[in-house]
């Protein structure tokens, strides 16, 4: 490798030339790959490190998204070409480097792990007779990206194929999934190469390295001064064995005309109303007037070029803290949620781990509940005559489990 190319590709590591050569050789050995196939190496984001650390503590932990997708062509009688579909996926992986990324430990450099981008890794792409027989939680190989695509052709009268995608949250979030499917459809139609270069996940890592982390952390310390752990079950005589679980409860009419009118009047969002509702639930079950919980920030509004087009986990868990004794009405509470959310958004890159450490929580959890808000509509991507529809999606609770584990 030439030193000039090394400087350009591996600049986010901040190593000198002698250190870099030894580092790359070591990483190749760790990952069981050849040095020649490594395109880039850079640090992980705080969220990625959080996931990797959680998995290392519990081998049973599964921080993955599983989705079943129906892929069709519009005209009756047309059939999906599996070979072409596989080639289209390869184009998507070529375009988005996070889909060619593996991970290796990096304790000796003050980090838990680093991510290694490979030039042309093997893609886990299989054809089966029944995708429902593919078990969840398969073991991914260390030397290939952490996802599996399983294709099942449908009967001729049903048209198309079913594709099951199981993918680790270390390399994707919900927003990214939509970009990935859209580009897959474009690639199958032969249109993806017409697009300009895509922004890469390394752009996000580079941005994080320029952030004033001390100033952001100080904001959170000020915002959380005097906060106490807000845990459910609380202190109201509820003595139950501690377990980890998640439940999904459909909320009907969440976008009713009455609620929409209420939000317009106060100039708030439906999510602010959901936050306010959960705040009141926490007061009920903890007996506390000063409560806090987590919520997910997409971080797609960061000042990074085309951040909305980056495939990779930009999400972060932020803290909502409310002192209910200072608020007089439900309207005031909802408006307080909005003001706090706007201010928190200016400091959204601070990791929850850094906040815990700065607060000297000493192994305690600040909260054990989190609120995420997304519509349960079916995602459908139609590009140039090919349609990909997500009709089973098991990603909804994963983000909360990542950050609360």
From Swiss-Prot:
GO terms for cellular component: cytoplasm. Pfam families: Condensation. Pathway: Mycotoxin biosynthesis. Keywords: Ligase, Virulence. GO terms for molecular function: ligase activity; phosphopantetheine binding. Residues 39-383 are annotated as: Condensation 1. InterPro entries: CAT-like_dom_sf (IPR023213), Condensatn (IPR001242). The keyword Aminoacyl-tRNA synthetase does not apply. One of its GO terms (biological process) is amino acid activation for nonribosomal peptide biosynthetic process. Its EC number is 6.3.2.-. Gene clusters encoding host-selective toxins (HSTs) are localized on conditionally dispensable chromosomes (CDCs), also called supernumerary chromosomes, where they are present in multiple copies. The CDCs are not essential for saprophytic growth but controls host-selective pathogenicity. Although conventional disruption of ACTT2 could not be accomplished due to the high number of the copies identified in the genome, the high sequence identity among these copies of ACTT2 is likely an advantage for RNA silencing, because it allows knockdown of all copies of this gene simultaneously. NRP synthetases are composed of discrete domains (adenylation (A), thiolation (T) or peptidyl carrier protein (PCP) and condensation (C) domains) which when grouped together are referred to as a single module. Each module is responsible for the recognition (via the A domain) and incorporation of a single amino acid into the growing peptide product. Thus, an NRP synthetase is generally composed of one or more modules and can terminate in a thioesterase domain (TE) that releases the newly synthesized peptide from the enzyme. PANTHER family: NONRIBOSOMAL PEPTIDE SYNTHETASE, NONRIBOSOMAL PEPTIDE SYNTHETASE EASA-RELATED. Belongs to the NRP synthetase family. Nonribosomal peptide synthetase; part of the gene clusters that mediate the biosynthesis of the host-selective toxins (HSTs) ACT-toxins responsible for brown spot of tangerine disease by the tangerine pathotype which affects tangerines and mandarins. ACT-toxins consist of three moieties, 9,10-epoxy-8-hydroxy-9-methyl-decatrienoic acid (EDA), valine and a polyketide. ACT-toxin I is toxic to both citrus and pear; toxin II the 5''-deoxy derivative of ACT-toxin I, is highly toxic to pear and slightly toxic to citrus. This is Nonribosomal peptide synthetase ACTTS1. It comes from Alternaria alternata (Alternaria rot fungus). The gene is ACTTS1.
